[in-house]
């Protein structure tokens, strides 16, 4: 039975509302509007924290499915003036929710939305709690009292036919409807003819829409919307629904909906199809009728599921067009064989063979082949040969049944959005086929053709795993298990008042976590610990709790409890969910009388972003809960054109070969290009699109060599890992809006011998902003991670552990796809091995710090040169600047800001315009790295190197650690000397400092501050003839202060 989709909004409560009645309270009610339908809750009298707990429903039966993603749910909250008059505005706040934030039933969660202002001068505060989700319900059964209704409809129909329409006579009950409601009343509709079983529709009459549940009988007016003031005056036309909440529901239908519902349906015009066939095949008049359509909606492989027809399709303007000759072999008839024949297609010296035909009423293949062609207009005219062979007698002794030849220059050119070419019947010539026909279609198209993804391509060698594919990462959640306490856990072998140690172990799949050991004497230990896991949808696993009693001989299991993940509540904020008591069952005890129990609080934290990438190259920061997603601010388009000068990655049949493919990852969407077989200069020319929610994210592209199933030196190596060729990262924030970048990037790999260039990849990328300019700039002021990361932050240990778990889950999920995305590819794209130790990275990071501080060092050097009058003109100008800033201190901040503005404006000329930044071997110190350091970087844990080499590396690391230890000691000593100024560790030094502070306080109190500042400035920039070459007394005094270094052992 068909179901009806509806939008359900649960208005739960509100908090901290604005007082409106003049007595410190308000009487709020909520009005919701969705697609012309309006609902209203009841009024909560004099309460700033009202609780409604009402469920309001909106019908989506008349809403086209592709337009559901563009609707907005508007919620307005008002103060009811009937419960406390006020001269001020009774507006309490509003929110607007896009339909992309709505989830299906079962995924909903209570979310508190902050109330927003309607205008700048509104005083709004507080938040409202909602649950919004889609629900499907079965239509109600037909009522048994339909016969009288049909009689009335039939009689009214006869009267209508006899009298005809009378436009001068007003419809009944019009005078009883209020003025504001009359504007939205539908015109009278003719009663549906299909409601009468005795009288069928006539061919010369237009078909009326079916009778709705709320339709009136005998041409009466349909129900109109009613306001609160006119509810008692207006005459009701239909009964309210039975499931209407306590509050008053206002249902308003827009004029567009009414006209759409009342528009008559015109019959489809007869479609006449003419088709040319070859030979003496008779013309088929009873062919399949094509579907009518007004606008071509040909989908391409760049479109997503959520794309709607109103969105412009990708035009493939970032890549080059690659022309293919497509041959679609559908079926054959009247073949003189009883086996499973095959078709062979030959073009330009390339021959391919189809799969064996399926024997039904005809011989069916329904297979499409694509031959690469340089251009649609060739000077020569190659011949396309299609032949049918009977393979039942063996592959080598196949019998020729017939064939067809085509001139490629006469094959039509098709480019979407053109409609697909219909296959035709062709008479087979030659062989043993005399009256055999083959149905096929041939055309010349590009990679934008909808048949291209599933076609057998010549550049992929027909490998099933070589197709282009779009993957979606599984939806990951953080599962928080709060272990509170346990009861009745005293083992029988222990006596009272004897301490016992207990530990709770939680396991989810391969994830195992344990609490700390809790010691108790009464059998009621307490932990209050949070255990975090990563869970992937769909939730089919179970969370297993095992309570262990710690003994000297080892842990002893006291009991176990299982909780299915589907029964765990979801939350999107830090509110406390209801806890539960779980009964523990002893797996070795058959008696289940008295059982111990444990107190647990379980929830899925949807307010976190599950990290699966390194923080500095993350491609998505959205939380798990879809309700918290912000609207997209733009789209990024990536054109993967091809690679050049690739090195052979493997040996196939004694010959070097590379079967390259590209993987791109952004957010939860992965794309994989087709695998170009045995080519060192592969061309893909595939274009993909992603939605951008945060511009400060990174798009990652990796190139790999596929092993597949090949004869490698005489043996099949199907289980070998795909080899890495290189990787490119593109930060979205570095792209200008609307500008297309087409660049060639080197593919670099760091191996044990150093940096190795394995080729180049040519990419085209473009970022298009879809959000308003101010909204787009407002994103830069928002935190990167969701709010829960700041309210209840995770520790570094938890982040690393959960990230490694998330990578394993994603790798296992994507490896089960077809074609699979292998785990080594996923780990390389997610940078799962970036946490390994490397002396090269240590030195590179140190040089990065030096480069950052270099600007400050230059400033200090310039100030020192100014002090010593190396440039007298500059020193005199600095004196004048000091005098001006001291006497006019209001100019200090503007001068600094103007100086930074000048620097930024000056550097604008030197910005990168064409090339995008990519991996820098010099910055990474990869071009000058020591071989021993690289070998140490690629060493596994635990090390598999010889003991002597491990000892040498350990001694080197000890030397580096000693230098780091010295630097840390110096930093700690300087801080301790600062503390010694007032701690009286050195009584004389502290006395001098305290006395000087008292003297400075008196001077600054008696002497104007500007005079003191000017004197200090002139003293600091005094001429060298007034200086002494010894260190300053202040520095000497600070160096003599004591530290705690002499107390270290």
Curated annotation (Swiss-Prot):
A GO CC term attached to the entry? endoplasmic reticulum
Free-text tissue specificity from the UniProt record: Expressed in the vascular tissues of roots, cotyledons and rosette leaves. Accumulates in roots meristems and shoot apical meristems (SAMs). Observed in flowers.
Cofactor requirement: Ca(2+)
Biased amino acid composition, Basic and acidic residues? 153-170, 226-238
- What superkingdom does the record give? Eukaryota
Membrane topology note? Multi-pass membrane protein
Please tell me where Ca(2+) 2 binds in this chain: 338, 390, 393, 398
Q: Which GO terms describe its molecular function?
A: metal ion binding
User: Could you say which residues bind Ca(2+) 1 here?
Assistant: 338, 390, 393
Q: What does this protein do?
A: May function as a signaling molecule by regulating the trafficking of other regulators.
- Its name, as the record gives it, is Multiple C2 domain and transmembrane region protein 16
Gene coding for it: MCTP16
């Amino acid at each position: 039975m068909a179901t009806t989709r509806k939008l359900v909004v649960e208005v739960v409560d509100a908090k901290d509302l604005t007082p409106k009645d003049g007595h410190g309270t308000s009487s709020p009610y909520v009005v919701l509007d969705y697609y012309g339908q309006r609902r209203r809750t009841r009024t909560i009298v004099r309460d700033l924290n009202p609780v409604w707990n009402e469920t309001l429903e909106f019908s989506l039966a008349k809403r086209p499915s592709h337009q559901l993603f563009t609707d907005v749910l508007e919620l307005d909250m008002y103060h009811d003036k009937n419960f406390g008059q006020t001269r001020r505005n009774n507006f309490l706040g509003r929110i607007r929710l896009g339909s992309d934030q709505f989830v299906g039933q079962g995924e909903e969660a209570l979310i508190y939305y902050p109330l927003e202002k309607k205008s700048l001068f509104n005083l709004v505060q507080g938040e409202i709690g909602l649950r919004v989700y889609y629900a499907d319900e079965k239509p109600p059964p037909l009522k048994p009292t339909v016969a009288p209704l049909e009689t009335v409809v039939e009689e009214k129909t006869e009267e209508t036919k006899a009298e005809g329409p009378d436009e001068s006579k007003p419809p009944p009950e019009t005078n009883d409807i209020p003025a504001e409601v009359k504007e939205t009343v539908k015109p009278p509709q003719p009663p549906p003819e299909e409601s009468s079983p005795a009288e069928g529709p006539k061919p010369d009459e237009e078909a009326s829409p079916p009778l709705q549940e709320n339709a009136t009988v005998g041409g009466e007016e349909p129900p109109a919307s009613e306001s609160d003031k006119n509810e008692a005056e207006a005459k009701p036309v239909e009964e309210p629904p039975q499931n209407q909440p306590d509050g008053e529901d206002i249902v308003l239908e827009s004029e567009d909906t009414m006209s759409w519902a009342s528009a008559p349906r015109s019959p489809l015009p007869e479609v006449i199809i003419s088709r040319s066939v070859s030979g003496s095949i008779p013309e088929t008049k009873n062919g399949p009728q094509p579907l009518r359509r007004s606008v071509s909606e040909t989908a391409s492989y760049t479109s997503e599921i959520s794309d709607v027809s109103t969105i412009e399709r990708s035009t493939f303007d970032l890549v080059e067009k690659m022309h293919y000759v497509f041959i679609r072999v559908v079926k054959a008839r009247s073949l003189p064989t009883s086996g499973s024949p095959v078709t062979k297609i030959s073009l330009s010296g390339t021959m391919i063979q189809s799969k064996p035909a399926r024997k039904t009423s005809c011989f069916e293949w329904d297979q499409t082949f694509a031959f690469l062609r340089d251009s649609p207009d060739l000077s020569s005219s190659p011949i396309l040969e299609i032949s049918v062979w009977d393979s039942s007698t063996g592959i080598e002794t196949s019998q020729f049944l017939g064939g067809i030849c085509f001139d490629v220059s006469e094959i039509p050119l098709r480019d979407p959005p053109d409609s697909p070419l219909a296959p035709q019947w062709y008479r087979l010539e030659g062989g043993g086929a005399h009256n055999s026909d083959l149905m096929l279609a041939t055309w010349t198209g590009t990679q934008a053709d909808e048949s291209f993804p599933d076609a057998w391509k010549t550049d992929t060698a027909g490998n099933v795993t070589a197709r282009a594919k779009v993957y979606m990462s599984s939806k990951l959640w953080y599962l928080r298990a709060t272990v509170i306490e346990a009861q009745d856990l005293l083992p029988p072998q222990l006596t009272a008042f004897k301490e016992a140690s207990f530990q709770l172990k939680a396991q989810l799949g391969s994830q195992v976590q344990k609490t700390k050991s809790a010691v108790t004497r009464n059998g009621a230990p307490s932990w209050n610990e949070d255990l975090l896991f990563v869970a992937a949808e769909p939730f089919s696993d179970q969370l297993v709790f095992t309570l262990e009693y710690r003994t000297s001989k080892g842990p002893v299991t006291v009991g176990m409890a299982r909780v299915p993940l589907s029964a765990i509540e979801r939350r999107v904020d830090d509110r406390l969910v209801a806890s539960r008591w779980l009964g523990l069952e002893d797996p070795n005890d058959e008696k289940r009388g008295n059982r111990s129990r444990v107190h647990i609080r379980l929830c899925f934290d949807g307010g976190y972003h599950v990290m699966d990438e390194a923080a500095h190259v993350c491609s998505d920061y959205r939380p798990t809960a879809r309700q918290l997603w912000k609207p997209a601010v733009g789209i990024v388009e990536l054109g993967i054109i091809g690679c050049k000068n690739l090195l052979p990655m493997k040996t196939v049949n004694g010959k070097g070969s590379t079967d390259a493919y590209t993987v791109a990852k952004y957010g939860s969407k992965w794309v994989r290009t087709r695998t170009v077989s045995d080519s060192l200069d592969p061309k893909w020319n595939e274009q993909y699109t992603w939605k951008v929610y945060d511009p400060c994210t990174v798009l990652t592209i990796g190139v790999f060599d596929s092993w597949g199933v090949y004869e490698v030196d005489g043996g099949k190596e199907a289980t070998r890992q795909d080899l890495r060729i290189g990787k490119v990262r593109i930060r979205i924030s570095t792209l200008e809006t609307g500008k297309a970048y087409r660049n060639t990037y080197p593919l670099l790999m760091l191996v044990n011998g150093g940096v190795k260039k394995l080729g180049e990849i040519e990419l085209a990328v473009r970022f298009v902003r879809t959000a308003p300019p101010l909204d787009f700039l407002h994103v830069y002021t928002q935190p990167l991670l969701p709010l829960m990361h700041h309210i209840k932050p995770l520790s570094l240990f938890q982040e690393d552990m959960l990230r490694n778990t998330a990578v394993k889950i994603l790798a296992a999920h994507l490896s089960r796809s077809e074609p699979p995305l292998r785990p080594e590819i996923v780990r390389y794209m997610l940078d799962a091995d970036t946490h390994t130790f490397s002396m090269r990275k240590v030195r590179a990071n140190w040089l990065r710090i030096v480069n950052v501080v270099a600007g400050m060092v230059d400033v200090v050097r310039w100030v020192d040169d100014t002090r010593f009058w190396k440039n007298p003109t500059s020193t005199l100008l600095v004196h004048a600047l000091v005098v001006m800033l001291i006497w006019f201190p209001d100019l200090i901040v503007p001068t600094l800001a103007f100086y930074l503005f000048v620097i930024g404006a000056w550097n604008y000329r030197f910005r990168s315009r064409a090339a995008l930044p990519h991996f820098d071997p010099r910055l990474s110190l990869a071009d000058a790295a020591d071989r021993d350091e690289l070998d140490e970087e690629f060493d596994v844990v635990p090390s598999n190197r010889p003991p002597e080499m491990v000892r040498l590396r350990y001694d080197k690391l000890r030397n580096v650690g000693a230098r780091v230890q010295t630097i840390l000691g110096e930093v700690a000593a300087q801080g301790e000397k600062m503390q010694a100024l007032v701690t009286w560790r050195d009584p004389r030094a502290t006395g001098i400092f305290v006395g000087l502070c008292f003297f400075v306080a008196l001077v600054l109190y008696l002497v104007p501050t500007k005079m003191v500042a000017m004197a200090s400035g002139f003293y600091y920039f005094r001429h060298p003839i007034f200086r002494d070459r010894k260190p300053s007394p202040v520095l000497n005094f600070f160096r003599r202060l004591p530290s705690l270094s002499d107390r270290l052992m």
